[in-house]
């Protein structure tokens, strides 16, 4: 599994899930990000996350395919 560390911008408390998937480059577009979330392919802290705009915060771990994204 490929580990990616994502640091929230200073002053930001969260990033929407679909924005995170685009920002780290594991999906090609926002519509693709929405599709993989809606299909139940993304896990947040070990649980399937179906909310496209879920607020991802520091300490969360997102998993999709062979990627593990740790939020700082």
Listing of model-derived features with the role each one plays in the protein:
Residues 15-55:
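A basic, amphipathic helix-loop patch mediating RNA/tRNA/ribosome contacts
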Residues 68-72:
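Short, Lys/Arg- and Gly-enriched loop/turn segments at beta-strand edges
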Residues 2-15:
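A detector for short, charged/polar N-terminal pre-domain segments
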């Amino acid at each position: 599994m490929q580990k990616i560390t994502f640091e929230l911008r200073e002053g930001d408390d969260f990033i929407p899930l679909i924005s995170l998937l685009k920002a780290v480059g594991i999906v090609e577009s926002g519509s693709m990000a929405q599709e993989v979330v809606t299909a139940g392919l993304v896990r947040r802290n070990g649980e399937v996350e179906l909310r496209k705009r879920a607020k991802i915060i520091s300490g969360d771990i997102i998993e999709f395919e062979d990627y593990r994204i740790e939020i700082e």
